[in-house]
C-alpha cells in the first residue's frame, strides 16, 4: 500500500510540475537589447529592417533620426586611407568593410569625408565573425569620433553591397534609427536570408 501511495505521489508531482511551466513570450525589447535598427527604403530588393550593434565606447549615440539619407559604400571599402568618394558620402551614412585598421579609424575617416554615421560590416564569408555581431571598441588612441558607428552582420553587408553593385547604384536610401519599441517581433520586416 505504501508503494502505491509513493507511485501516486510521484505521478501527481510530475503532472503538477509539467502543468506549471511558465511560457514567457519574446518581446521586442528582448530582441532590441540595446541595438539600433535601420530600414532601407530603396532599392526595393533591399527594403528590410536591419540590426546594428552600436560602438561600445567611441563615437556618439544614434540619437538623431536621419530620414531618406544615402547609405554609401566607401572607396576604398575598408576606409583605412582617405575616402575617395567623399562627394557621394557627404551627408550620408558610410558602409565600410571590417579589417586592416581599427573601427575608430574607419569611423574617423568617414566623419572626415562628411558622413553622418558609419556602418561597419564583415565582408569575408569564411571569417568566423561573418554571422556574429562584434563589439566595436575604442583603439586606445587619443582620438574620438563625433558621429555614431555600428556593426552590421556580414551577411547583410555582403548582400547590400552586391545588390547595389549589381544594380549599378551609388547608394541605397535609409532611415536610421528606426524605433521598434512597440512593434511586435512578428511584424519586424527583417531580411528573409537571416531567418530570425
Swiss-Prot record:
PA domain ranges (all copies): 73-171
Annotated signal sequence range: 1-18
GO biological processes: muscle cell fate determination
Keywords from the UniProt entry: Glycoprotein, Secreted, Signal
Keyword Glycoprotein: yes
Glycosylation sites: 179
Subcellular location: Secreted
Main localisation: secreted
GO CC terms: extracellular region
Reported function: May be involved in iversification of muscle cell fates.
PANTHER family: PROTEASE-ASSOCIATED DOMAIN-CONTAINING PROTEIN (PTHR22702), PROTEASE-ASSOCIATED DOMAIN-CONTAINING PROTEIN 1 (PTHR22702:SF1)
Name the UniProt record assigns to this protein: PRADC1-like protein
Species annotation: Drosophila melanogaster (Fruit fly)
Amino acid at each position: 500500500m505504501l508503494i502505491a501511495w509513493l507511485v501516486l505521489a510521484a505521478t501527481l508531482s510530475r503532472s503538477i510540475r509539467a502543468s506549471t511551466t511558465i511560457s514567457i513570450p519574446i518581446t521586442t525589447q528582448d530582441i532590441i537589447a540595446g541595438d539600433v535598427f535601420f530600414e532601407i527604403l530603396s532599392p526595393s530588393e533591399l527594403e528590410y529592417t536591419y540590426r546594428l550593434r552600436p560602438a561600445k565606447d567611441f563615437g556618439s549615440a544614434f540619437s538623431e533620426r536621419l530620414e531618406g539619407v544615402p547609405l554609401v559604400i566607401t572607396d576604398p571599402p575598408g576606409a583605412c586611407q582617405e575616402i575617395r568618394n567623399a562627394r557621394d558620402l557627404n551627408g550620408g551614412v558610410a558602409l565600410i568593410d571590417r579589417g586592416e585598421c581599427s573601427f575608430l579609424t574607419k569611423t574617423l575617416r568617414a566623419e572626415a569625408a562628411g558622413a553622418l554615421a558609419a556602418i561597419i560590416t564583415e565582408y569575408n564569408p569564411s571569417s568566423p565573425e561573418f554571422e556574429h555581431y562584434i563589439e566595436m571598441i575604442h583603439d586606445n588612441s587619443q582620438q574620438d569620433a563625433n558621429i555614431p558607428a555600428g556593426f552590421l552582420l556580414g551577411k547583410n553587408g555582403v548582400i547590400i553591397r552586391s545588390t547595389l553593385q549589381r544594380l549599378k547604384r551609388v547608394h541605397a536610401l535609409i532611415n536610421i534609427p528606426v524605433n521598434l519599441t512597440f512593434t511586435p517581433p512578428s511584424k519586424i520586416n527583417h531580411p528573409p536570408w537571416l531567418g530570425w
